[in-house]
């Protein structure tokens, strides 16, 4: 039995926690734990503080479901943004990615999960903000195509134009794995859904 490893419970627990982060394997987790625990403990303390602050202050916007540190996010409270377009995305991280492109100046709506979509509240928002177009910014998959059709069907009485970002985004690939030029081109070449 390896008693050396058994004597490093705290270190191995840190490795185990880091390994649970998406795209971090055992070797990377070990390197990070070693760096934080031995080579740069000041960074570890800053990271601990940043994590505590994020957990205390991060929430979702009550209007669009994007990440926010207040009840209404900065995008929803920005009166200079175009109200006629609403870009629907699957995850809050998609808002970050699309905002970095600086191609879209409208509003967002993050679905998170189709099971929890409050279509009544969404419809009230569409009317209140005078939305005329919903842009689906979903990665191209059969499931997402079905989701777009479902949403169109639920909102057909609202007399909206439904568009989706153009193909060119590879099927089955998440936004964070696509270069900004391809994503920007796909967004600006969106087509009627």
Curated annotation (Swiss-Prot):
Q: Which UniProt keywords apply?
A: DNA damage, DNA recombination, DNA repair, Metal-binding, Zinc, Zinc-finger
| Gene Ontology MF: a single term | DNA binding
UniProt-listed InterPro entries: DNA_Rcmb_RecR (IPR000093), Rcmb_RecR (IPR023627), Rcmb_RecR_Znf (IPR015967), TOPRIM_dom (IPR006171), TOPRIM_RecR (IPR034137)
Instruction: Look up keyword ATP-binding and say if it applies.
Output: no
Q: Zinc finger regions typed C4-type: which residues?
A: 61-76
Pfam families attached to this UniProt entry: RecR_HhH (PF21176), RecR_ZnF (PF02132), Toprim_4 (PF13662)
Q: What is any one GO biological process for this UniProt entry? A: DNA repair
Q: Which PROSITE patterns match?
A: RECR, TOPRIM
Q: Locate the Toprim domain: which residues?
A: 84-170
Does Signal appear among the keywords?
no
Q: What is the recorded function of this protein according to its Swiss-Prot or TrEMBL entry?
A: May play a role in DNA repair. It seems to be involved in an RecBC-independent recombinational process of DNA repair. It may act with RecF and RecO.
Q: Which family does it belong to?
A: Belongs to the RecR family.
This one is known as Recombination protein RecR
Species this protein is from: Helicobacter acinonychis (strain Sheeba)
């Amino acid at each position: 039995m390896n008693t050396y490893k058994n004597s490093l419970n705290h270190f191995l627990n840190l490795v185990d926690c880091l390994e649970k982060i998406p795209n971090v394997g055992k070797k990377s987790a070990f390197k990070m734990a070693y760096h934080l625990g031995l080579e740069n403990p000041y960074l570890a303390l800053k990271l601990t503080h940043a994590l505590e602050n994020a957990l205390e202050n991060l929430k979702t916007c009550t209007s669009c479901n994007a990440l926010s540190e207040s009840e209404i996010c900065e995008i929803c409270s920005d009166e200079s943004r175009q109200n006629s377009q609403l870009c629907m995305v699957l995850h809050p991280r998609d808002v970050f990615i699309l905002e970095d492109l600086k191609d879209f100046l409208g509003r967002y709506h993050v679905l998170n999960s189709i099971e929890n979509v409050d279509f009544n509240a969404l419809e009230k928002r569409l009317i209140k903000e005078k939305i005329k177009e919903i842009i689906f910014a979903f990665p191209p998959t059969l499931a997402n195509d079905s989701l777009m059709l479902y949403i169109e069907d639920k909102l057909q009485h609202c007399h909206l134009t439904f568009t989706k970002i153009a193909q060119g985004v590879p099927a089955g690939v998440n936004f964070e794995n696509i270069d900004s030029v391809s994503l920007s081109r796909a967004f600006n070449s969106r087509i009627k859904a």
